[in-house]
């Protein structure tokens, strides 16, 4: 548990590398780590807390308990019998969680250690990049239930695998393998199941050792710049760059290079 954050009922938090990396684990393995209303509320709360004050955390790793299912999507047992109003009210919770996550200034690595279906794949798509087990499957199955992806799936998946492939995946609802996900560029690396989280933590440590303001500005520039006309995006990148010129870390980085030592970045 990370003592600087509250205890959650549906999430486990573990601090790594002297508090620079936070491992966030979805913790409802008895129901395939499916999202219920409480999990949505707790995730939103955590993302908002990290946005306001990260307490020194420079990188997140998101994974799940149980090892077989990363996340099965929304808890359909909880949704069974919901009125239209109850359904929409719950989905607003999931929407707020989604927007809070994609607006996180610090990077999030998804360590997808089990099957990721529906909303489970959608939250994975909200991560900055993914590592996955080599024996799992992904799917957006919403059309088989009379709905459609509603937490970024129709926007994030095409940006990851291309529009035509995303249409086939979403319109058929058919699952695909981690090997296919790697081939299509959805996941960066695939590993043996027991190695996924450790590999993600290792990469998180590397990211956390870099200048945190530089990492944040890089994430911001890529995310927002990719939605702009190219020339505007170039200028947006320069504005992000210019914010780093007047920082202590910029001075420290150049000084450390010339002194042939490892820099000590403080995020100032």
Where are these regions (language model features)?
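Structured loop/turn residues at beta-strand edges in well-structured enzyme cores
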Residues: 6, 19, 55-57, 74, ...
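Crotonase-fold acyl-CoA enzyme core
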Residues: 102-213, 243-247, 251-255, 261, ...
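Conserved CoA-thioester-binding segment of acyl-CoA-metabolizing enzymes
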Residues: 1-63, 81, 99
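Hydrophobic alpha-helical membrane-association signature
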Residues: 39-43, 90-93, 123, 196, ...
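Phosphate-coordinating loops and pocket residues in cytosolic domains that bind phosphorylated ligands
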Residues: 34-37, 72, 81, 171, ...
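Glycine- (often His-adjacent) and acidic-residue-rich active-site loop
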Residues: 44, 64-99, 116, 146, ...
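C-terminal alpha-helix plus adjacent terminal tail
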Residues: 1-20, 51-55, 67, 173-179, ...
